[in-house]
Amino acid sequence: MICPAPPPPPCSTLVQSKPQLLAWLTCDGVHIDPGSGKHTILGIFSNIQARQFPVTHPFMIWFLTLSDVSPGKHALKISMGLEGTAPQQLLDRPFESQSPLHRINLINELRNLRFDQPGDYSILIEVDDEPILATSLTVT
């Protein structure tokens, strides 16, 4: 006797991967072309130099692109702290995904970010409380 195979699960349950981070940039600005929707990234940097501490960086953008995000509402959290200290949550924002195939560009503005001393500041990026990137920003 041959038993028929059970029906396959719906497509939405076949792929349950965690979101993938395709791009992470620290920059001075992002221009979105109103005609094409293309993003132009301005002034990419990877460290901050100061003459004295504490120092306050007046404005920066953390630009990121995500893919493989399941449809629905989600939360992006970004925390930062000096190596060896507890990170402070700087950002907690909602975003929405229409499909895991879509690429989602998120532009996150940070104003008056204070650095009390030089060092490597750890940055943790989470989507729905799942870490997707741990990196650092050097401040000298």
Model-derived regions, located:
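Contiguous segments within soluble domain cores/interaction surfaces
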Residues: 6-140
